Amino acid sequence: GPLLGDRGGSYQVGREGLRAVFRPGGAPTALREELVHFAGLSSVDHLKQEIVPLSVRILGDRTAVAHYAALVNRCARAGDPVAVAILEQAADDLSETIEYLVRQADVAGCALPMVGTGGMIRHSDIYWNRLVRQVTGFLPQVRPLRQDMPQVAGRALAGLREAIRNGACHVDAAASRERLLATLPPLLAEIRPQQETPSLRTTR
């Protein structure tokens, strides 16, 4: 998890975004205004007044930190250099983990696929492009495959495959797979919009 590992994940991105906001003497960044809105505050000055209770609330909810990663990505897309640097560092950290695994498995000379899943990869071109560049440096024949569907799609496909294999579902496998892939995205969009970022409203 994020306390011991998970380098390069959304928790790291959100955490570094929050650190950039509160770092004394830190570079100007649009992340401050994003946090003001995220926390339901009225201004940056209000943010300074609420720093202690806000910190306690954020530390008590790790998902709030991970959700802030979407705001870091938004600022990065708008050209904020602090946000861009956070995403690139996270991608570098993940690439180091991949490099370790590649060397341990002794497959640096192989042509292997790299399937990218998860929110950071799905929603951030900056993150994904940086990751691909870094991995290509130690795995030249890598085939980057960016999956634009959530991980639940893979679980649904695995469940369908098992149901067909066990005889619990008598349907055409290929047709069922295509139907699932076609109907899942709009269904998920209705349940939970992409990059949903719930507000962290302050309370008295």
Predicted regions and their residues:
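Hydrophobic alpha-helical segments and helix pairs
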Residues: G1-P28
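ATP-binding/phosphotransfer module of carbohydrate and carboxylate kinases, centering on a glycine-rich
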Residues: R19-R204
